[in-house]
Amino acid sequence: MFSIQQPLLVFSDLDGTLLDSHSYDWQPTALWLSRLREANVPVILCSSKTSAEMLYLQKTLGLQGLPLIAENGAVIQLAEQWQDIDGFPRIISGISHGEISQVLNTLREKEHFKFTTFDDVDDATIAEWTGLSRSQAALTQLHEASVTLIWRDSDERMAQFTARLNELGLQFMQGARFWHVLDASAGKDQAANWIIATYQQLSGKRPTTLGLGDGPNDAPLLEVMDYAVIVKGLNREGVHLHDEDPTRVWRTQREGPEGWREGLDHFFSAR
């Protein structure tokens, strides 16, 4: 049993979880975001998005100044009050965006894999793909430690591509809409554990953690949470955890931000 009155951290995915996958609406979560803010509970956004995108969303959601996890854990944006921590304002794990881009270009040229990266197109094209405004689409191209792409080849070729990336110290990760290439050592779980440890070091007590996500790339994050909400999503593979004890894990009936609200209602409304 836990409540929002105790030391607590909430980690949340964005697209398909806190945000609607198509409209990007977040209004169903507004009441809970307000309650958590009033209780001084940090809501830590955790996504494949760039830090530039997420800083913009933090302001929209009233979460500015809090830490966030960008690019599937390859980038950690530190909290504003953590200016004494080495690496402030951002910690970047492993291989840089530029280095990954070079690897992908070589694989495409020499082994003829078919894919289109966000670096291959302009912001107008990304806006068309995503439904974002052009100014917001431009933020999606400001990668620091990963590459986002659309796969345009067969499943067999994807397996070969994944194996080649693994040999080179990279991983290939499926998101809600796109695929992502990043350093094999990076992950939402490692980033979350670092943030949890930092809060524990600063407060002297380990906070209870709640995570929310809807896609396969959220599973590592949810595995390291004390409690988890698996938001009903569009991905055919779904989310599967090693420990799905119903006292720890709640699968929502609703999708997107409605499911996010349902998960918070489940764990807190009766407490």
UniProtKB/Swiss-Prot annotation:
In the UniProt entry, which residues are flagged as the active site? Answer: 13 (nucleophile)
Q: Which GO terms describe its molecular function?
A: magnesium ion binding; mannosyl-3-phosphoglycerate phosphatase activity
Catalytic activity of the protein:
2-O-(alpha-D-mannosyl)-3-phosphoglycerate + H2O = (2R)-2-O-(alpha-D-mannosyl)-glycerate + phosphate
Subcellular location(s) of the protein: Cytoplasm
Just give the chief location class: cytoplasm
| Enzyme Commission numbers on file | 3.1.3.70
| Gene Ontology biological process terms from the UniProt entry | mannosylglycerate biosynthetic process
| Keyword Metal-binding set for record | yes
Q: Which GO terms describe its cellular component?
A: cytosol
Alphabetical UniProt keywords: Cytoplasm, Hydrolase, Magnesium, Metal-binding
Q: Which residues bind Mg(2+)?
A: 13, 15, 214
- Cofactor(s) listed in the protein's UniProt record: Mg(2+)
Q: Which family does it belong to?
A: Belongs to the HAD-like hydrolase superfamily. MPGP family.
- State what protein this is by name: Mannosyl-3-phosphoglycerate phosphatase
Where does this protein come from, organism-wise? Shigella sonnei (strain Ss046)
Lineage of origin = Bacteria, Pseudomonadati, Pseudomonadota, Gammaproteobacteria, Enterobacterales
